[in-house]
Every structure is written in C-alpha cells, then in structure tokens.
C-alpha cells in the first residue's frame, strides 16, 4: 500500500511540474525520484482485472530514464516524460479499481489483488516512500493492530432511522402523544408531541426521551444543539404502526423545557449539558441520550388559548423538538463523511464493473446496512478500499 501511494505521489508531482519551459534545476529532485521509480519497476510484469466485467490487462515495464539538462525542459523532453507518466497512471488506476472490487472475510486489511500483493514485495521498497496521507498512516497502524484515529467532518455515523412511538394512542378521538424522530448521517432530529398540550399531565408537563446508540465510539466531537426539529414542523399524514390506518399531525411549535443531553461510554456518563444550545463538545461516547419536556403555557393570549382548548377536538398539536448535529469528530474506525468521496468512488467502481456481491459488503455498498452491522471484517475491508480510493483520487478525479 505504501508503494502504491508513493508511486501515485511521484506521478502526481511529475505530471504537475514537468512542463515545457521549466528550468531543469527546479524539478531535478522530482526527476531523480521519477527515475528511481522507473528503475525499480522496469523488468516487472503485472496483471489486473478479471473480476466482474473489469477486463484483464497485462502490464510490462521497460522505460528509459529521463536525462539531465542545463537548460529549460523542451517539448521533446516533456513528451517523453508524458508518455511514461500516462502509462504509469493507467496502471495505478487499474490496480486501484482491481483492489476496490475485492473483499475478504479474513485479514481484509491486507492487499487482495495480485498486482498490489506483488507491489508489496521487498524489491519495491526502494521506491521513495511518502507516507504523509492520513489514510496510509492509519492503514499502517491498523495493519499492525494498533490504535488508529480518523478525523471526520459530518461523519455518517447514524444509520437511517425514521419512526415514532406513541405513549397515548386514541387516533379515533384525535388524541395522541409520543415521540417521532429522524436519524441519518451525522444528524438527529427528534420531536415530542401531545395533541392535548399536556392538559391532563402531572403539572401540565410531558417528558420525552430519545436514546441513540452509535456503532462506533467517537472522541473529541464538536456538536451543534438546536431547540427545534424543523423536519417535524409542518403538517403530515402518518401511517399507524400496524399500517391499518393513518393519523393527522398538525404541529404548533413550542420551545422545549428542561433540555438535557447526555453522552455515555459503556453505560457511564461522560458529558452532560443542561439547557445548553449552540456548539458543545463531547470527549468520548458511544451513546447519546436526549431528554426534554413539553410544558403547557401557564398564561396564554386568546389566540394561543384557541390553539390549545380544554377539550376535544384538538385541531392543533403541541410539539417540541431538538436537533443534534455532529460537525466533526475523531473515530478509530473509518467512516464516510461529507468532506470525502471515498464511499462514492468505491461504490461507483463496483457498480460500473458489475462486481458480484461478496462475503463482506452489502449489495450496492448500502451504507445504512453496512454501518448497522459494522463487523471487524467490514471495518478492515472498508479501511483498505477507502485507502486505495484516496490514492486513486490523487490521479483520477
């Protein structure tokens, strides 16, 4: 993997900087590194493809070295370099696609394609290493079963979940009370509602709670908390739990009371925030507990009082909500996030070349299913294919 990254970094630098008119002295270090790569690769043969519809291709390396000059690089010099660079880039592209198409239940962190296994041989260690990539650094740590750390922005840590629970259910009488939520990606939105606006609740207060367990623990997370759940702020028709009927939801938004956010790790509370909105941090957690209250307003103007009558029918439904959004965090496991296209790159290659469903990844690389059942085998394979995708993205956009 280190060799694959180093070759790609060398090719990227050469493609960007070996251009007509450039002084040789300005790119001599790159050319020297480029020539070392050629010397190491010459005389070797590789084969890629042969999975799904990815075609089998054979690769042979026999290229001349780039020479020295005291002057600027001319068109002939650059053309010779370009021919070599384009062949190498095509080779790296196919090695990466071959690797992204493969998976293994055992030791999925290790190279799976014949070409990348061969590149892992001792003879290729002479290629100048450049291990500045976060993915390469973490791949090396994971390969040695040491602790890794990925920095994510808006990590896709929550499997998609959209549902509701009813604590009071009288749909025929238009009198419901409960919680509805939408968890997806890096965001939780949860709303508590009471059609009667806590009319007969103790002290005219309804208590709501929403607990979310993460599939992987996060550390040093920056989180935004808002006293609203905008996705539940407009009327809708909702199917009953048994699918036998539907019920109408017509929310009127109130501000939640006694909001408390708890972050837990292995059942122990690590951080607690009460009535705190905006930006907060959480040190280390694998569970989030949100609790909040709906309080019937003790004093109401006639207009508000008309919204929340003392008896049925309840045409407007008191609703309070919270939004929790993970803006950034560190995780020991690789995840998809909003700043990267690794999941999309891997999925696109597997779809384009009709890669058959294997023993590890779900059909279509369905992220909700993948993260819901995030096994060690999936973690190893995902880290490997994401690392390869990050290498490929240096050369292929």
From Swiss-Prot:
It is found in: Virion. InterPro entries: Capsid_hemagglutn (IPR008980), Rotavirus_A/C_VP6 (IPR001385), Virus_capsid_a-hlx_vir (IPR008935). Its main location: virion. Keywords: Calcium, Capsid protein, Intermediate capsid protein, Metal-binding, Ubl conjugation, Virion, Zinc. Residues 62-73 are annotated as: Interaction with the inner capsid protein VP2. GO terms for cellular component: viral envelope; viral intermediate capsid. Zn(2+) binds at residue 153. The N-terminus is blocked. The VP6 trimer contains a zinc ion located at the center of the molecule. The zinc ion is not essential for either trimerization or transcription activity of the DLP. Zinc-depleted VP6 has an increased sensitivity to proteases. Belongs to the rotavirus VP6 family. This is Intermediate capsid protein VP6. It comes from Rotavirus A (isolate RVA/Equine/United Kingdom/L338/1988/G13P12[18]) (RV-A).
């Amino acid at each position: 993997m280190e060799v694959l990254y180093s070759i790609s970094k060398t090719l990227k630098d050469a493609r960007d900087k070996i251009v007509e008119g450039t002084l040789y002295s300005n790119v001599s270090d790159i050319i020297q590194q480029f020539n070392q790569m050629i010397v190491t690769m010459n005389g070797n043969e590789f084969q890629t493809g042969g999975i799904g519809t990815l075609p089998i291709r054979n690769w042979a390396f026999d290229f001349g070295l780039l020479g020295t000059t005291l002057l600027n690089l001319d068109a002939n010099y650059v053309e010779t370099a370009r021919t070599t660079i384009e062949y190498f880039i095509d080779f790296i592209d196919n090695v990466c696609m071959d690797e992204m198409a493969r998976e293994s239940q055992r030791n999925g962190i290790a190279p799976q394609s014949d070409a990348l296994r061969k590149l892992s041989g001792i003879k290729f260690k002479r290629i100048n290493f450049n291990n500045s990539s976060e993915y390469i650094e973490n791949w090396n740590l994971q390969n040695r079963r040491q602790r890794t750390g990925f920095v994510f922005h808006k990590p896709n840590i929550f499997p998609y979940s959209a549902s509701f629970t009813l604590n009071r259910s009288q749909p025929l009488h238009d009198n419901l009370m409960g919680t509805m939520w939408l968890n997806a990606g890096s965001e939780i939105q949860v709303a508590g509602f009471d059609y009667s606006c806590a009319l007969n609740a103790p002290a005219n207060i309804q208590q709501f709670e929403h607990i979310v367990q993460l599939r992987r623990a996060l550390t040093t997370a920056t989180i935004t908390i808002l006293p609203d759940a905008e996705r539940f702020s407009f009327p809708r028709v909702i199917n009953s739990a048994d699918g036998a009927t539907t019920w109408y939801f017509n929310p009127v938004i109130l501000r939640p009371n006694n909001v408390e956010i708890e972050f837990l790790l292995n059942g122990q509370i690590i951080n607690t925030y009460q009535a705190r909105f905006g930006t907060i941090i959480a040190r280390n957690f694998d569970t989030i507990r949100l609790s909040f209250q709906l309080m019937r307003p003790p004093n109401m103007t006639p207009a508000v009082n008309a919204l929340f009558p003392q008896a049925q029918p309840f045409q407007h439904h008191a609703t309070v909500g919270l939004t929790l959004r993970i803006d950034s965090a560190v995780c020991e496991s690789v995840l998809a996030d909003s700043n990267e296209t690794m999941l999309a790159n891997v999925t696109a290659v597997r779809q384009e070349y009709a890669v058959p469903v294997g023993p590890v990844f779900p059909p279509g690389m369905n992220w909700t299913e993948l993260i819901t059942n995030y096994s060690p085998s999936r973690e190893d394979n995902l880290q490997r294919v994401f690392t390869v995708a990050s290498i490929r993205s240096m050369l292929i956009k």
